[in-house]
């Protein structure tokens, strides 16, 4: 996961 993923959320972070 990246910083952007964390900001967007876990669901999107998994992608």
From Swiss-Prot:
Instruction: Give an example GO molecular function.
Output: lactoperoxidase activity
Which EC class, in a word? oxidoreductase
Q: Does the keyword Heme apply?
A: yes
CC cofactor note: Binds 2 calcium ions per subunit. Binds 1 heme b (iron(II)-protoporphyrin IX) group per subunit.
**Could you tell me what reaction this enzyme catalyses?**
2 a phenolic donor + H2O2 = 2 a phenolic radical donor + 2 H2O
* Keyword flag Metal-binding: yes
A Gene Ontology BP annotation from the UniProt entry? hydrogen peroxide catabolic process
Task: Identify its protein family.
Answer: Belongs to the peroxidase family. Classical plant (class III) peroxidase subfamily.
Instruction: State what this protein does.
Output: Removal of H(2)O(2), oxidation of toxic reductants, biosynthesis and degradation of lignin, suberization, auxin catabolism, response to environmental stresses such as wounding, pathogen attack and oxidative stress. These functions might be dependent on each isozyme/isoform in each plant tissue.
Q: What is the protein name given in its UniProt record?
A: Peroxidase 3
Species whose genome carries this gene: Daucus carota
């Amino acid at each position: 996961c990246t910083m952007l993923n964390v900001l967007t959320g876990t669901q999107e972070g998994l992608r």
